[in-house]
């Protein structure tokens, strides 16, 4: 029997977002007080992200017969991330050149007050490439889980899973125990997900109440350019990759619509990470590939953040009438390819990454970030949405490359018939 429409999660989330926008617009002071609802939901999700990643990766690797496969999957994923990330960076640059959202502002850089962005600049300067790599190694195993550091947890899980795979049957008891814990954790996620409408309402009410719809008007062209470019990236770039792999990007987006609406309401792609991993497994991707690609992608495959970075830098240059040579723009691309790897799926990380990029391109004043500080919160939704779609597509693609994609289950899931028997599915 089909659920009444008002009991469907994505309908509830849409309604919550609309109510949040209305409350923020009509009663801003009250709406700002709703912030704990959004923060609380994200904290509940983040509470289980670390353990889920650990358990999923460990059981996936422990079940692999060939340990060389772990390195092969990781290598293919990183190669895919670099290629697609470069496309995203170039597309952001090209779209800003064509649509020129910053032209006409004629702002004197000397009049900009950089104090408002000083904290972001300080965070950006605080970590070099070596620091980033060293940060992947945790001080202790417990510390990695306590701090919720995804890459550190991933490293521990890789080592743990590798040892279990080497032990074989001697490690079967531990593997089965961790597999049971995984089921419990996903059960917790199902319970927490029911609170998604509350979280989306609180986060959206706070955003509109604090920043106001009026703050969007002067920079609507930049916002429109960014959203349009992100849509083009998903439909054209990711769409072409999806078609080549054998599935429809439109149907895939429809398949993860609940996760996308949670991200839209919270502006954090991490808020939907556990649900996305579960959905990808149900769509025919092997657990081992999902466990390796999705967590890694949250640091190395942020397509929306990549588009935003090159677009924001060029917008500031246009708004302050600074001409960038082609060599400077190529330098910008190279720098952005490195700095973007330090971004995570948490709200606000994109702005810190932008500060890191500008710090290495001194031609453009760091104080220019103040021009987009007020609208960054509204652009973060689009960044997070593009990021999660990009990571989902990446997982399906790498699964196909590894011949670990159950195409029958994939097509059944994307067509809305998720009850296809896994045993009838053909491995490709």
From Swiss-Prot:
GO terms for cellular component: plasma membrane. It holds the Pfam family SDF. The keyword Transport applies. Its main location: membrane. One of its GO terms (biological process) is L-aspartate transmembrane transport. GO terms for molecular function: fumarate transmembrane transporter activity; malate:proton symporter activity; succinate transmembrane transporter activity. Keywords: Cell inner membrane, Cell membrane, Membrane, Symport, Transmembrane, Transmembrane helix, Transport. SUPFAM superfamilies: Proton glutamate symport protein (SSF118215). It is a multi-pass membrane protein. HAMAP family: C4_dicarb_transport (MF_01300). Belongs to the dicarboxylate/amino acid:cation symporter (DAACS) (TC 2.A.23) family. Responsible for the transport of dicarboxylates such as succinate, fumarate, and malate from the periplasm across the membrane. This is C4-dicarboxylate transport protein. It comes from Burkholderia thailandensis (strain ATCC 700388 / DSM 13276 / CCUG 48851 / CIP 106301 / E264). The lineage of its organism: Bacteria, Pseudomonadati, Pseudomonadota, Betaproteobacteria, Burkholderiales. The gene is dctA.
């Amino acid at each position: 029997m089909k659920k009444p429409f008002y009991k469907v999660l994505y309908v509830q989330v849409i309604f919550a977002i609309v109510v949040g926008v209305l409350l923020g617009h009509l009663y801003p002071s009250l709406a700002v007080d709703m912030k704990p609802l959004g923060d609380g939901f994200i904290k509940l999700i983040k509470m289980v992200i670390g353990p889920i990643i650990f358990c999923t990766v460990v059981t996936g690797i422990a079940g692999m017969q060939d340990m060389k496969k772990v390195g092969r999957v990781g290598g293919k994923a990183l190669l895919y991330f670099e290629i697609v990330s470069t496309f995203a960076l170039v597309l952001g640059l090209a779209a800003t050149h064509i649509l020129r959202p910053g032209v006409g502002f004629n702002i004197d850089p000397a009049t900009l007050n950089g104090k408002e962005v000083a904290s972001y600049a300080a965070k950006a300067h605080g970590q070099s490439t070596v620091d980033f790599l060293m940060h992947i190694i945790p001080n202790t195993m417990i510390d990695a889980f306590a701090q919720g550091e995804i890459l550190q947890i991933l490293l521990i899980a890789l080592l743990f899973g590798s040892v279990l795979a080497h032990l074989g049957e001697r490690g079967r008891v531990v593997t089965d125990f961790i597999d049971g814990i995984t089921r419990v954790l996903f059960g917790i996620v199902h319970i927490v997900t029911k609170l998604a409408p509350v979280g989306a309402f609180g986060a959206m009410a706070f955003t509109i109440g604090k920043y106001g719809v009026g703050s969007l008007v002067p920079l609507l062209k930049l916002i429109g350019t960014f959203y349009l470019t992100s849509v083009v990236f998903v439909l054209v770039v990711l769409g072409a990759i999806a078609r080549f792999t054998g599935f429809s990007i439109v149907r895939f987006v429809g398949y993860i619509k609940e996760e996308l609406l949670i991200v839209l309401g919270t502006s954090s792609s991490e808020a939907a990470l556990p649900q996305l991993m579960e959905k990808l497994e149900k769509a025919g991707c092997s657990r081992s590939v999902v466990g390796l690609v999705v967590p890694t992608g949250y640091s190395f495959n942020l397509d929306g953040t990549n588009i935003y970075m090159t677009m924001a830098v060029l917008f500031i240059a246009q708004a302050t009438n600074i001409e960038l040579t082609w060599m400077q723009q190529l330098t910008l691309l190279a720098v952005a390819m490195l700095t973007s790897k330090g971004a995570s799926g948490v709200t606000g990380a994109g702005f810190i990454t932008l500060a890191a990029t500008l710090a290495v391109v001194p031609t453009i004043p760091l104080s220019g970030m103040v021009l987009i500080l007020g609208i960054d919160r509204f652009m973060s939704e689009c960044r997070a949405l593009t990021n999660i779609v990009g990571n989902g597509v990446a997982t399906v693609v790498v699964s196909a490359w590894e011949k670990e994609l159950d195409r029958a289950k994939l097509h059944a899931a994307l067509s809305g018939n998720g009850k296809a028997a896994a045993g009838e599915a053909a491995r490709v």
